[in-house]
């Protein structure tokens, strides 16, 4: 079946050329060149409203084509503006989104349409690069459409008085719920305060929280609410009409022990080697570790494994994202940095190796596939004691179908451990990933399901392929189960070397420095002991060598000892064991009289 025809049929039969008020010829041509003929439901509902100068609050499923739903009307509104064409530093449109990646994506989508406007320049403003570089571009080239993250946008607006917002036509707040969740309310409020009230505003959000409602009240004027829901056949039969999962998405869960998870993941990657997957982990350290160790498994050598997370430098994230976007197959290993907003084409499978801390992120993760009417699959790995999550998600109108563990999955733990014994980088990253996961698990929003005290760290450590269990205060204090872990025998872990010769050289130098420091401390300790021994024979000399605080501490201890002795003697007097004159002699009280 022709995929494009299937997409169009699954979404809507409304063409962009059929919309009212009609779109300009330049926009229709730009849409056709990008193979956009038919609208998605959110596009068909939203574009006419914004083009009719209405404020909109849009609540749509993830993967619904929201970007074009505001980019197209933004360009149309600018074209029809009385201020068109604008002066070089006259800002007519602002688009705010929560992450650098999403802002970059919006900018790239918008470029073909903005370029249809003569003398209009759009500028991308995100963190990760020098703010002075952005200021120089704006000063020299001008800017009429600002697209970026709240932090960098507000920073530029505060610094550059040259920017003129008096004739601004339209403001777009994309992923508004995420903007608030990430703590950008102050910056968003500042940006809105700098803009004229006589403008069009579009607020796009996957969830309608109280914060989003408040933002809508403050930033929108009599908005039209647009709600677009995707509904699958299985959901219809269960009357789950409010589900936000895309209609072509097949959701599954796999229940397996912690020491079997890594083997099941490798088996899944092998069986889908010709597909494009996203694998979600809970922490940045986990992404780093699995990105390194999975590449050591011979059966995965032919599969492109690309890690990306929020702690990576911006240019590294951009490079990784571009590489995966261009690839026809492979796996993107990531944290929730890629769970929302990133519209990576052609994702076939989403794997949630670790369930998200925030259950609201589940759909955003799974929604990276089955976008724009395509078919897709998503699976979440669960431990046996986490099975209640299935019922929890069903109540939230996200039904999960069970998938059994693969019986022919090869045990990869020996391979992982072998890699750790050959390269200290693997061993150390594994320990760091394990510790970060255990601590992150404690912060689960659904702690009644993901019970930290029930975490079997022995099996978990085996699943990570650790050589030994790290010393953790959390483990010692709460006695988490270490059953199921088999430590590696006959290996001196301190002697495992880095494969990277430079890192190993640095390690050896650091070891030598620490060794010399310990020897020096040992010498100093010996000197102190000799001094203390000498001082003990000469109390006055010892007293002179002590600081005031040390003398006070010693005096307090001596006083407490005397008080304790006197109290015990007093008890003996009361019991008639000794006479009062004996008490006075022993305590020295008779010296006072």
From Swiss-Prot:
**Could you tell me which residue ranges the Helicase ATP-binding domain spans?**
47-226
Q: Where is the Helicase C-terminal domain?
A: 264-411
State the span of motif (DEAD box).
174-177
Q: Which InterPro entries match?
A: DEAD/DEAH_box_helicase_dom (IPR011545), Helicase_ATP-bd (IPR014001), Helicase_C-like (IPR001650), P-loop_NTPase (IPR027417), RNA-helicase_DEAD-box_CS (IPR000629), SPB4-like_CTE (IPR025313)
Q: Keywords in UniProt for this one?
A: ATP-binding, Helicase, Hydrolase, Nucleotide-binding, RNA-binding
Listed GO molecular functions? ATP binding; ATP hydrolysis activity; RNA binding; RNA helicase activity
For whether the record's keyword set contains RNA-binding, the answer is yes
* Disordered: annotated segments: 506-561
Which principal EC class is assigned to this enzyme? Answer: hydrolase
Give start-end ranges for motif Q motif: 16-44
Specify which residues bind ATP according to the UniProt entry for this protein.
60-67
Q: Where is the composition biased (Basic and acidic residues)?
A: 506-524
Q: What is its EC number?
A: 3.6.4.13
Looking up Pfam families in the UniProt record yields:
CTE_SPB4, DEAD, Helicase_C
Catalysis performed (reactions): ATP + H2O = ADP + phosphate + H(+)
What is said about the domains?
The Q motif is unique to and characteristic of the DEAD box family of RNA helicases and controls ATP binding and hydrolysis.
Tell me its family.
Belongs to the DEAD box helicase family. DDX55/SPB4 subfamily.
Q: What is this protein called?
A: DEAD-box ATP-dependent RNA helicase 18
Q: Please give the organism.
A: Arabidopsis thaliana
Q: What gene name is listed for this protein?
A: RH18
């Amino acid at each position: 079946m022709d995929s494009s025809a299937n997409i169009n049929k699954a979404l809507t039969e409304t063409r962009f050329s059929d919309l009212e008020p009609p779109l300009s010829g330049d926009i229709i041509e730009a849409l056709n060149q990008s193979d956009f003929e038919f609208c998605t439901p959110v596009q068909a509902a939203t574009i006419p409203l914004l083009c009719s100068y209405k404020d909109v609050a849009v609540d749509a499923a993830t993967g619904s084509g929201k970007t074009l739903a505001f980019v197209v009307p933004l360009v149309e509104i600018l074209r029809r503006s009385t201020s068109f064409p604008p002066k070089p530093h006259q800002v007519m449109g602002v688009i705010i989104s929560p992450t650098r990646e999403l802002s970059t994506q919006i900018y790239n989508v918008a470029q073909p349409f903005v370029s249809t406007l003569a003398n209009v320049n759009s500028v991308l403003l995100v963190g990760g690069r020098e703010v002075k570089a952005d200021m120089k571009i704006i000063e020299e080239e001008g800017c009429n459409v600002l697209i970026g993250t709240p932090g960098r946008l507000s920073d530029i607006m505060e610094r550059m008085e040259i920017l003129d917002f008096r004739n601004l036509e339209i403001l777009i707040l994309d992923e508004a719920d995420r903007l608030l969740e990430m703590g950008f309310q102050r910056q968003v409020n500042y940006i809105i305060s700098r803009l004229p009230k006589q403008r069009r505003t579009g607020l796009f959000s996957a969830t309608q929280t109280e914060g989003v409602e408040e933002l809508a009240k403050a930033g929108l004027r009599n908005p039209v609410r647009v709600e677009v829901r995707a509904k699958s056949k299985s959901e219809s039969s269960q009357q789950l009409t409010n589900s936000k999962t895309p209609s072509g998405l097949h959701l599954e869960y796999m229940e397996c022990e912690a020491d079997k998870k890594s083997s099941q993941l490798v088996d899944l990657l092998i069986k889908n080697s010709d597909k494009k997957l996203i694998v979600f982990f809970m922490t940045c350290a986990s992404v780093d570790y699995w990105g390194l160790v999975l590449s050591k498994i011979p059966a995965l050598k032919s599969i492109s494994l690309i890690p990306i997370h929020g702690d990576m430098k911006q240019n590294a994230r951009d490079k990784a994202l571009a590489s995966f976007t261009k690839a026809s197959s492979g796996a993107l290993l990531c944290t929730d940095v890629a769970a929302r907003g990133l519209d990576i084409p052609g994702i076939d499978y989403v794997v949630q190796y670790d369930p998200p801390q925030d259950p609201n992120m589940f759909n955003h993760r799974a929604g990276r596939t089955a976008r724009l009417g395509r078919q897709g699959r998503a699976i979440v790995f669960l431990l046996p004691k986490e099975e209640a999550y299935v019922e929890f998600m069903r109540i939230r109108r996200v039904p999960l179908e069970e998938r059994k563990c693969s019986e022919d999955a090869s045990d990869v733990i020996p391979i992982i451990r072998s890699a750790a014994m050959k390269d200290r980088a693997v061993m150390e990253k594994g320990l760091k990933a394990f510790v970060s996961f255990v601590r992150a698990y404690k912060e689960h929003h659904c702690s009644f399901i993901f019970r930290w005290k029930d975490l079997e760290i022995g099996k978990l450590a085996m699943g990570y392929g650790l050589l030994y269990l790290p010393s953790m205060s959390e483990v010692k204090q709460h006695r988490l189960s270490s059953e199921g872990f088999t430590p590696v025998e006959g290996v001196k872990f301190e002697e495992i070397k880095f494969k990277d010769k430079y890192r190993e050289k640095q390690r050896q130098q650091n070891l030598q420095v620490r060794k010399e420091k310990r020897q020096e401390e040992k010498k100093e300790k010996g000197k102190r002991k000799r001094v203390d021994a000498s001082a003990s024979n000469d109390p006055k000399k010892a007293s002179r060598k002590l600081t005031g605080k040390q003398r006070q501490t010693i005096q307090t201890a001596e006083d407490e000892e005397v008080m304790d002795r006197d109290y015990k003697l007093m008890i003996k007097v009361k019991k008639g064991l000794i006479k009062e004159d004996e008490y006075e002699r022993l305590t020295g009280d008779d010296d006072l009289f």
